[in-house]
Amino acid sequence: MLIRIVRRLTLDEVKSKIKQFEEEHDTTFDDFEELFLSRRLDRSRVGKYFEWASLVHAYRGYVEGGELDYIIEETRELSPEQTALLTPKRLELLYSLASLQAESINKLAQKTKRNVKNVYYDLKTLQRLGLVVFRRRGRRNIIPETLIEEITLVIR
């Protein structure tokens, strides 16, 4: 089964992609941008410039304001085993996580009227599929977050 996902990138993913661009082009973004602005950049690399620029601007926005906003669309092929993990309860939990403000796994379990242990297990499964991340706040509080903006299952 194919799955089409529109999601936000994590900070680590943005940093990694910026580093990949620097290694691939053997230069910094500022130098690459100078080539673009002075019209000395090869036409085949213009698309790369815009992608790199949007990553750098998103990262700089994060540094200045603490909010990272970079959205990508990707298509993944799920194995039959992975497809089986997308149960109705887990998809419902993913939807609830996106629409409810949950300060912890306990609060999410309360809001969805489910057992905390089952919610935690389902969140860990969704994390392995790359649909959920956990953010630690304080010493004990773990906050589940979804990076998913949109998900489409393509059955073929």
Region locations from a protein language model:
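DNA-contacting interfaces and partner/effector-binding or oligomerization modules
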Residues: 1-43, 48
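Short alpha-helical segments that sit at the start of domains
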Residues: 64-92
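Short, cationic-aromatic polyanion-contact patches
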Residues: 79-88, 104, 136-156
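Short amphipathic alpha-helical interface segments
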Residues: 88-102
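Residues within the DNA-recognition helix of helix-turn-helix
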Residues: 122
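A short, conserved structural fragment
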Residues: 128-137
